[in-house]
């Protein structure tokens, strides 16, 4: 059995990448593997809930303080003090390297291209590293098109979501890009009958998911008796654009 360290992109469960990897961890534990997770510290009740959720499936979490957890040029907040951010990046790599050594990790897996610290730490410790890619290198994630060589060099194996993404990425890499299917456990529930008709959009409000187009389409529907509901987190700048249009 293996001892596997995951690097998570967010300290939340409001996105598909995080949800799918949570259930992958659960499955790996059921197979007898030991799973540990590293993500960034956010503190307070949200972090406590996150930690409890992972404890339920037997995963130990490490929460590392940082200025920005993703690449400097990735979406998700601007870096105001580059020197401070660089210092945290270095510290995060060192901390992950120590976690690898202390826990005798056999494999490091980075979930999404947005986190790179685990790739460097795994290389320092001479431990295999897998990269799971969920994003197309365009629109808000276009920044990582310039990092293809780095991603390839610091990956023992590359994986992307099966289908269009895998077809898109395959010619960009010299190394084979394996495919995987994101998995989420679903509970069957009987829906309550209601009197209100709603259009419901579930998922993080981001430019990549382009909910603004749904809002515009809803406007053309011109049916005030039908509600449009969004459920999930949001990127502040994109939410402001949607709010302004509304």
Feature locations, PLM:
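A conserved mid-protein helix/loop that constitutes part of the nucleotide-sugar donor-binding site
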Residues: 15-23, 197, 206-220
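Short amphipathic alpha-helix
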Residues: 16-28, 46-50
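Glycosyltransferase donor-sugar binding loop
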Residues: 38-46, 202, 227-243
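Conserved nucleotide-sugar phosphate-binding/catalytic loop shared by glycosyltransferases and other
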Residues: 39-78
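Donor nucleotide-sugar binding/catalytic pocket of nucleotide-sugar-dependent glycosyltransferases
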Residues: 62, 153-189
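Short beta-strand->alpha-helix junction loop in the catalytic core
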Residues: 67, 137, 164-165, 180-189, ...
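Short His-centered aromatic/hydrophobic patch
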Residues: 110-115, 133
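A conserved, positively charged/aromatic
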Residues: 129-156
């Amino acid at each position: 059995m293996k001892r596997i360290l995951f690097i998570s992109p967010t300290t939340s469960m409001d996105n598909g990448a995080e949800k799918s990897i949570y259930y992958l961890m659960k499955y790996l534990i059921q197979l007898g593997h030991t799973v540990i997770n590293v993500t960034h510290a956010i503190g307070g009740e949200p972090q406590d809930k996150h930690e409890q959720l992972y404890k339920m499936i037997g995963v130990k979490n490490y929460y590392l303080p940082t200025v920005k957890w993703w690449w400097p040029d990735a979406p998700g907040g601007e870096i105001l003090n580059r020197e401070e951010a660089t210092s945290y990046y270095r510290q995060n790599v060192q901390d992950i390297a120590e976690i690898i050594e202390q826990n005798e990790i056999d494999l490091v897996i980075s979930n999404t291209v947005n986190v790179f610290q685990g790739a460097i730490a795994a290389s320092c410790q001479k431990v295999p590293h897998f990269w799971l890619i969920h994003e197309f290198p365009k629109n808000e994630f276009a920044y990582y098109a310039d990092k293809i060589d780095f991603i390839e060099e610091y990956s023992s194996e590359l994986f992307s979501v099966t289908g269009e993404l895998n077809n898109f990425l395959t010619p960009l890499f010299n190394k084979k890009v394996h495919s995987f299917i994101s998995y989420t456990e679903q509970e069957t529930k009987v829906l309550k009958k209601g009197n209100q008709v709603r259009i419901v959009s579930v998922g993080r409000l981001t430019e990549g998911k382009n909910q603004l187009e749904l809002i515009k389409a809803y406007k053309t529907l011109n049916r005030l008796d039908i509600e449009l509901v969004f459920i999930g987190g949001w990127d502040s700048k994109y939410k402001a654009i949607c709010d302004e249009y509304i």
